[in-house]
Amino acid sequence: MIKIKITPLKGIDIESVGEILLGQTKNDVLRLLGRPSEYHAANSLLYEFYELRIDFDGSGKVEFIEFIYGPFPERTELSLYDINPFNIGADRLIALLSEHNNGEIDDSDGGISYAFLNSSVGVWRQFTQKDVEEGIAQAKLSGQYQHNPSSFDDDLGNSRNFWTIGIGVAGYYRL
């Protein structure tokens, strides 16, 4: 597994490759990581090998780095504050990020996403554990649960962690 250390407000350090820093130029990123898997948009590069996406501001400088494979990495092992953010559970990750954020948190999305405004860290998942548990209860009442219980159980397992984590430049989530 490729070890990647995430440092909010600074950037990432990819073991045996080097650092991608917030504010670094697109050309510097291309020199370090090579050609991307996909030019996701005019100002976005997707590197599937490193399981991440890098967004650039209008000046061509790194403004956001997002890890997109969540708790199902194929090649990477992440470290944020010396902990893998995708293996500790959503509640523990929120507590950890809150402790290091030391300020305002945008939690207006009903537990689906959180933006830690001081540390410029964001996390996202498709649904919460509560959402899935309510869906299971309704499916059991309607008789639909028994037709595909493994799908519901998979969703329940997936709801226990966030699926993406991103870091941005200072003030990224205040823009």
Model-derived regions, located:
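Short helix/turn-capping signatures at newly exposed starts of structured segments
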Residues: M1-L175
